[in-house]
């Protein structure tokens, strides 16, 4: 997929949302907040096609469940720095480049569909969890694929640079399944590989699979199957060793979740018609998500 907008040309006004009171201390030298204050701009990473978390709608506006969190964090930064007119730049990122671009300072944080796990914590820091998912399979309805055991000797697609790619390769090696694993650039490319018949199944986080199904020409032709191979926690990603910025992000997320606002966002993006095709994902709030909204935390689940 080609980037539809240059990274430096996308400007967005962050939407207002319920905000937590941030730490009143001045930004620490060298911190993300200090960088933002000095430059007069906050640079936010986003995904292009992670429906319904972070993606372009029909007007090329970045929208989604995770983007609502991102907007709330931007508003909290404006309040913290007393800069209501702070410039906001949005840049598109992928599963492959999100960590390097964060580390080299290209963007300040991102809320998308990034799993917080122990391995990634060596490279980046994560906010409180914003979503909990399970990794499953999207396949043609009524076909032969009902669970992961049916993938033996079959072609399976997965998005490159994701934890699902790691899991699928591990499963293939440990179970001697002789799968032909296709690594696609992004979730949209993964689904097109499935849709074209080049793969019999697409392995990914269940909520993202529901998003790809909702975008399909004929959503009813596809079903999500299989016992979850892992449970994963999505968090907003920021640079390591920046406790002040992490606290601002965590406080904002906790306020949104405990106030009931996050559940409204969930209903908006997972239980109602959404762009670009006004299709309903019909994805119910899980017990894990209900528990998260009651007690926000930043625990990695794997």
UniProtKB/Swiss-Prot annotation:
InterPro entries (UniProt xref): Bact_solute-bind_prot3, Solute-binding_3/MltF_N
Keyword flag Metal-binding: no
Identify the stretch annotated as signal peptide in this record.
Answer: 1-22
Is Signal one of the keywords UniProt gives this record?
Answer: yes
* Coiled-coil ranges (or none): none
Which superkingdom heads the taxonomic lineage of this protein's source?
Bacteria
Subcellular location(s) per record = Periplasm
Any Gene Ontology CC annotation: ATP-binding cassette (ABC) transporter complex, substrate-binding subunit-containing
GO terms classed as biological process: amino acid transport; L-aspartate import across plasma membrane; L-aspartate transmembrane transport; L-glutamate import across plasma membrane; L-glutamate transmembrane transport
Q: Which Gene3D superfamilies match?
A: Periplasmic binding protein-like II
Subunit and interaction comment: The complex is composed of two ATP-binding proteins (GltL), two transmembrane proteins (GltJ and GltK) and a solute-binding protein (GltI).
- Function comment: Part of the ABC transporter complex GltIJKL involved in glutamate and aspartate uptake. Binds to both glutamate and aspartate.
* Protein's UniProt name: Glutamate/aspartate import solute-binding protein
């Amino acid at each position: 997929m080609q980037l539809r907008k240059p990274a430096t040309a996308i400007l967005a006004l962050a939407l207002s949302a319920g905000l937590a009171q941030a730490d009143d201390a001045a930004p620490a030298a060298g911190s993300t907040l200090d960088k933002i204050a000095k430059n007069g701009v906050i640079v936010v990473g986003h995904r292009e096609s992670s429906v319904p978390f972070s993606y372009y709608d029909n007007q090329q506006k970045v929208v989604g469940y995770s983007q609502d969190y991102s907007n709330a964090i931007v508003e909290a930064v404006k309040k913290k720095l007393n800069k209501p007119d702070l410039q906001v730049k949005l840049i598109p990122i992928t599963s492959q480049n999100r960590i390097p671009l964060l580390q080299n300072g290209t963007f300040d944080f991102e809320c998308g569909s990034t799993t917080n796990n122990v391995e990634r914590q060596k490279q980046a820091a994560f906010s409180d969890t914003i979503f909990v998912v399970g990794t499953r399979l999207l396949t043609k309805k009524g076909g032969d694929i009902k669970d992961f055991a049916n993938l033996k000797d079959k072609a399976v697609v997965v998005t490159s640079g994701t934890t699902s790619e790691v899991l699928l390769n591990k499963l293939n090696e440990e179970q001697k399944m002789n799968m032909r694993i296709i690594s696609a650039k992004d979730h949209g490319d993964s689904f097109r590989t499935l849709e074209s018949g080049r793969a019999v199944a697409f392995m990914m986080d269940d909520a993202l699979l529901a998003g790809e199904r909702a975008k399909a020409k004929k959503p009813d032709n596809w079903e999500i199957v299989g016992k979850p191979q892992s449970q994963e926690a999505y968090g907003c990603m920021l640079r390591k060793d920046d406790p002040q910025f992490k606290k601002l992000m965590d406080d904002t997320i906790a306020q949104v979740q405990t106030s009931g606002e996050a559940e409204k966002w969930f209903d908006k993006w997972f239980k109602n018609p959404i762009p670009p095709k006004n299709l309903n994902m019909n994805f119910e709030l899980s017990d894990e998500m209900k528990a998260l909204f009651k007690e926000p935390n930043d625990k990695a689940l794997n």
